[in-house]
């Protein structure tokens, strides 16, 4: 099955119409939710998506530096460098970033979920979380392959240390558990320390 063209997907984005003193104003649903400080991180983590997320985080900080931002995540993961651009911005800005997993947060998606403000990281009941070591592949001369292998091992160690800090798990446990794809239910993600609570309703 082929992915729908972007123009078709854009046409399917719902519009919200609001009455203002100057008349009616329409927003696409994501822009309207951005006014409520809600950001969606959905799909593959890559450079273009990361730039959009970073821009929204910086914009909301400039609007109200003391109000929380809500980052909803449904992602299979993706690029480490793109993910780290989002992560570093989350840590850099003044507002707390509350993370919510809906659907799945895998690989870099899980890392960003864990990187939310402590006490404000959540999973919806039927969401899934998956952690593992970074993936890499490179072709070329043996010396270049060795350089890239060393870089990937360095990234792996750095991510493991950061995940240990965010979850409270010992580093050796993180190293063991990320050695292969490690899937968790929402409840298990709470127990592991990737998130702080399970959200079943707004109440």
UniProtKB/Swiss-Prot annotation:
Active site per database record: 107 (nucleophile), 132
Keyword flag Hydrolase: yes
Top-level division of the source organism's lineage: Bacteria
GO molecular function, one term: ATPase binding
CDD domains, A to Z: S14_ClpP_2
GO CC entries: cytoplasm; endopeptidase Clp complex
EC number: 3.4.21.92
Localisation: Cytoplasm
Family annotation (SUPFAM superfamilies): ClpP/crotonase
Chemical reaction(s) catalysed: Hydrolysis of proteins to small peptides in the presence of ATP and magnesium. alpha-casein is the usual test substrate. In the absence of ATP, only oligopeptides shorter than five residues are hydrolyzed (such as succinyl-Leu-Tyr-|-NHMec, and Leu-Tyr-Leu-|-Tyr-Trp, in which cleavage of the -Tyr-|-Leu- and -Tyr-|-Trp bonds also occurs)
Primary location: cytoplasm
Keywords: Cytoplasm, Hydrolase, Protease, Serine protease
Lipoprotein as UniProt keyword: no
Pfam families tied to this protein: CLP_protease (PF00574)
Single biological process term from Gene Ontology: protein quality control for misfolded or incompletely synthesized proteins
Subunit structure of this chain's protein: Fourteen ClpP subunits assemble into 2 heptameric rings which stack back to back to give a disk-like structure with a central cavity, resembling the structure of eukaryotic proteasomes.
Protein family per UniProt: Belongs to the peptidase S14 family.
HAMAP family registered for this protein in UniProt: ClpP (MF_00444)
General function of this protein: Cleaves peptides in various proteins in a process that requires ATP hydrolysis. Has a chymotrypsin-like activity. Plays a major role in the degradation of misfolded proteins.
Protein name: ATP-dependent Clp protease proteolytic subunit
Species of the source: Shewanella frigidimarina (strain NCIMB 400)
């Amino acid at each position: 099955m082929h992915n729908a063209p972007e123009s078709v997907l854009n046409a399917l984005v719902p519009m919200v119409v609001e009455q203002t003193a100057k008349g009616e104003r329409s927003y696409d649903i994501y822009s309207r939710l951005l006014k409520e400080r809600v950001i969606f991180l959905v799909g593959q983590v890559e450079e273009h998506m990361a730039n959009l997320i970073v821009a929204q985080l910086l914009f909301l900080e400039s609007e109200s530096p003391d109000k929380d931002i809500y980052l909803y995540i449904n992602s299979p993961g993706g690029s480490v460098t793109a993910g780290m651009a989002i992560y570093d911005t989350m840590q850099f800005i003044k507002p707390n970033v509350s993370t919510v997993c809906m659907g799945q947060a895998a690989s870099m998606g899980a890392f960003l979920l864990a990187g939310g403000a402590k006490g404000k990281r959540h999973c919806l009941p039927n969401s899934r979380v998956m952690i593992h070591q970074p993936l890499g592949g490179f072709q070329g001369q043996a010396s270049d392959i060795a350089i890239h292998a060393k870089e990937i091992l360095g990234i792996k160690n750095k991510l493991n240390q950061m995940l240990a800090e965010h979850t409270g798990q010992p580093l050796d446990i993180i190293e063991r558990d990320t050695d292969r794809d490690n899937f968790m239910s929402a409840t298990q993600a709470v127990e592991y320390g990737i998130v702080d609570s399970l959200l079943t309703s707004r109440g």
